[in-house]
């Protein structure tokens, strides 16, 4: 890396100003709360995270693959937040903002050290700090993973520059360690070996310019050597990819989107590359979710995108003297590969958060190109300074406004509905927000619209079924739960739909069918205690007391529950096992001393009195 000193007073002042700019832009996040899109799975309803930083929680973090990812460091960072701030969202937002500010400063010093250009580096870092596309990563607590993996990525780039100055095993090991930590925060950093090859080309200059036949031959020889140098890092990437595929297979995340043909996915990927560039230049109408067009995308769009992408790629190859062009362009294209949608994960066409690091390639191209093409401009410093200031004010104002939309689930998804058509995710989550405030009547309309806009969206059918069941419209609710089972993406959602369908069937006194539904729920989620209890109740009604006792015992072992233990006692009574019934009643009373029915039956058994008659001898 360049020998310029990065600890001089000017650099420190610039870094401080970058932090101030970042804090000023994102200050509204401190008044934002949690939202009902992934924040429940990551924080608000995750009982491991809610315990704070514990040994059992950290052990769980290293083996957990929920939320379709393996990212133990992300889990641990959320646990640290709960340990420090409990469930105060301002504290969680403060941690995310700290990481983003840290990334901004790291980026500035990284570019400064690598290129020696102070003001160019500062401008790239400043736009990165306030660009509205990055709001999603900063304002969304669930996107801690993007911030954290980027921190380790930038640290790995610093370590790589240190290694390049004096190659050695210890220095390379530090690069590998930081890369591994980044992968343990979010697997999107999987492209780091490719990114390091780009840094070898520019700005590190480890590859010769392929301008002559002799130079091209040397270029390929050197490129092969540098690629082999990255082999240990590539092995880490492959290991991370394997773990990620396993995690997503367990939640059915990839398989659920296999109905999208490869041509459809490629068309959307090409168009998304162009849309990210459009939003980089004109970042308006941003939303938390952009519905996938599936097979409705006009053919001219991917064709136009492919043409423009090829033209600019050809332009970069024709201007190899400006190495930053090809390096920045390939950085943008390459870093988006894991999330561009060729392997479709999730239902989105694209996502703002995916541009967090790929956007850097475009920023470098723009800033370096403007600087290189304006040396003879009259009053160059004043003009470039004014243009830079206006750009930062523009982006910062838009980012602050976008941050305000993240205040709560209502503002977030109402805005998404305003700027994106047929946004079935926004409709569904807005409905969930109304459920949380006790307005199922308003939620109903949003769930219904979600199912109309996306008939194959299982979660909306499930939520609609819950509302209908609450209105005692059991037949309609049952149909919605069946749709949720048919179209559900994740095992947990499908298991819950089976469970609720069983409850509806119980209300209709269809005992055998209900029993089958609860059994399916347990098959999908063997640790779902409520389904064991529901199946036990059904078996008790059908006089299968041995099976009922087994299910009540299983449910109570998963989550100690006085009601489950009481009915375990009743089942054992029916089997003539009074000693076992006594044990169950005592355990129930230990959990709930005022459980009168358990106390009454326990006293009758102990005293030898006739057992009291229950008017309804079933759950």
Say what each PLM segment does.
Residues 1-472, 476, 486, 493, ...:
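Polytopic membrane enzymes that build or remodel cell-surface glycoconjugates and lipids
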């Amino acid at each position: 890396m360049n020998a310029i000193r990065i600890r001089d007073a000017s650099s420190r002042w610039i870094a401080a100003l970058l932090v101030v700019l970042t804090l000023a832009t994102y200050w509204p996040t401190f008044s934002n709360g949690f939202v009902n899109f992934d924040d429940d799975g990551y924080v608000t309803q995750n009982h491991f995270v809610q315990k704070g930083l514990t040994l059992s929680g950290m052990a769980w973090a290293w083996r957990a693959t929920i939320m379709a990812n393996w990212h133990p460091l992300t889990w641990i960072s959320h646990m640290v937040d709960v340990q420090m701030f409990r469930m105060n969202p301002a504290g969680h937002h403060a941690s995310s903002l700290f990481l983003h500010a840290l990334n901004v400063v790291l980026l500035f010093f990284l570019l400064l050290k690598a290129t020696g250009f102070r003001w160019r580096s500062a401008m790239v870092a400043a736009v990165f700090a306030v660009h509205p596309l990055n709001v999603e990563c900063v304002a969304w607590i669930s996107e801690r993973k993007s911030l954290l993996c980027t921190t380790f990525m930038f640290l790995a780039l610093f370590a790589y520059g240190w290694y390049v100055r004096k190659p050695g095993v210890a220095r390379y090991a530090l690069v590998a360690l930081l890369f591994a930590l980044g992968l343990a925060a979010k697997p999107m950093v999987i492209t780091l070996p490719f990114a390091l090859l780009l840094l070898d080309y520019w700005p590190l200059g480890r590859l010769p310019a392929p301008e002559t036949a002799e130079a091209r031959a040397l270029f390929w020889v050197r490129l092969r050597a540098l690629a082999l140098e990255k082999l240990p890092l590539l092995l880490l990437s492959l290991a991370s990819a394997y773990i990620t595929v396993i995690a997503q297979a367990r939640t059915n995340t990839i398989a659920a989107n296999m109905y999208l043909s490869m041509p459809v996915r490629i068309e959307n990927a090409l168009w998304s590359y162009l849309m990210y560039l459009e939003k980089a230049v004109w970042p308006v109408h941003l939303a938390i979710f952009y519905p996938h067009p599936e097979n409705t995308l006009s053919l001219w769009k991917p064709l136009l995108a492919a043409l423009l992408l090829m033209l600019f790629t050809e332009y970069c190859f024709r201007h190899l003297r400006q190495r930053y062009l090809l390096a920045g362009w390939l950085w943008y294209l390459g870093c988006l590969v894991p999330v561009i949608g060729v392997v479709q994960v999730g239902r989105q066409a694209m996502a703002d958060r995916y541009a967090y690091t790929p956007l850097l390639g475009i920023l470098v191209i723009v800033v370096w190109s403007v600087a290189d093409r304006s040396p003879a401009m009259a009053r160059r410093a004043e003009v470039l300074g004014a243009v830079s200031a206006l750009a930062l004010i523009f982006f910062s104002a838009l980012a602050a406004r976008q941050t305000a939309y993240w205040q709560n689930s209502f503002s977030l998804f109402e805005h998404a509905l305003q700027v994106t058509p047929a946004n079935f995710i926004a409709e569904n989550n807005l409905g969930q927000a109304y459920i949380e405030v006790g307005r199922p009547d308003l939620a109903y309309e949003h769930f219904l619209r979600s199912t109309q806009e996306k008939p194959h969206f299982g979660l909306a059918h499930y939520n609609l079924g819950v509302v209908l069941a609450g209105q005692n419209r059991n037949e309609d609710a049952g149909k919605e739960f069946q749709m949720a089972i048919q179209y559900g993406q994740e095992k947990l959602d499908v298991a819950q739909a089976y469970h609720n369908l069983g409850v509806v069937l119980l209300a209709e006194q269809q005992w055998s069918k209900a029993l089958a539904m609860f059994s399916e729920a347990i098959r999908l989620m063997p640790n779902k205690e409520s389904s064991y209890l529901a199946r036990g109740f059904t078996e008790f009604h059908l006089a299968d007391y041995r099976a009922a006792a087994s299910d009540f015992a299983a449910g109570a072992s998963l989550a100690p529950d006085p009601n489950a233990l009481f009915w375990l006692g009743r089942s054992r009574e029916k089997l003539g096992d009074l000693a076992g019934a006594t044990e169950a009643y005592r355990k129930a009373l230990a959990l709930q001393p005022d459980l009168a029915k358990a106390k009454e039956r326990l006293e009758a058994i102990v005293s030898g009195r006739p057992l009291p008659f229950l008017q309804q001898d079933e759950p």
